[in-house]
Regions:
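A glycine-rich, hydrophobic loop/mini-helix early in the fold
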Residues: 27-53
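Acidic/His metal-coordination segments adjacent to aromatic residues that form catalytic metal sites
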Residues: 15-17, 52, 92-105, 137-145
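Extreme N-terminal tail/first-helix region
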Residues: 1-26
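Compositionally biased, intrinsically disordered low-complexity regions enriched in proline and serine
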Residues: 9, 14-16, 99, 111, ...
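Residues that cap or delimit alpha-helices
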Residues: 17, 40, 125-126
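Acidic/histidine-rich alpha-helical segments that form the ligand environment
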Residues: 23-35, 93-130
């Protein structure tokens, strides 16, 4: 049974605990680079189980998720209370051929998008962190919540990558 949007949010926030989401996000790119630096191309493309993403697919997903996060934050800043559309990550993975993506190029894209997002987050006033949008599945989400979700999402996928590399 698939978890609900609220169950997902609760589970994923557990990875972040009391850590600063901006610091976690700032550290992610280097950690990902270290994790994949010595992995072979075949290891990066190997699915750990049927229907589970390879490291290459995870990296492509992380890069695309940064685009989504970037848009959501900017949309909220431009029009607080704006609707936030959900996206189907599996449909994106299929439509954009994540399985065929170059993992190192995906990491490069992720790094570029992440840097832009961190620059924006660091420029926000305390009041802007409270601006919110209305997520189609999860309801009201502030920029602060989006930053926490993004950091938690990083930690979730890094655990997956570490597990795949240890197999």
């Amino acid at each position: 049974m698939q978890e609900t949007a609220q169950e997902y949010k609760q589970r994923i926030f557990g990875y972040l605990a009391q850590n600063d989401p901006v610091k976690v996000q700032a550290a992610t790119a280097k950690k990902l680079g270290r994790l994949i630096s010595r992995a072979s191309a075949s290891k990066l493309r190997k699915q750990p189980a049927p229907g589970k993403w390879s490291i290459s697919e995870i990296l492509a997903h992380l890069a695309d998720t940064e685009v989504v996060v970037s848009y959501r934050i900017r949309a909220i800043l431009g029009a607080p209370g704006t609707p936030i559309q959900a996206f189907d990550q599996d449909k994106w993975a299929q439509a954009m051929s994540y399985g065929k993506s170059d993992p190192r190029r995906s990491l490069e894209r992720f790094i570029a998008f992440r840097k832009a997002n961190l620059d924006l987050l660091k420029s926000l006033s305390p009041g802007q962190w409270k601006y919110h949008g209305m997520h189609a599945e999860r309801g009201e989400e502030s920029i602060e919540t989006i930053a926490k979700l993004s950091a938690s999402h990083d930690l979730n996928h890094m655990r997956q990558i570490e597990k795949i590399l240890s197999q």
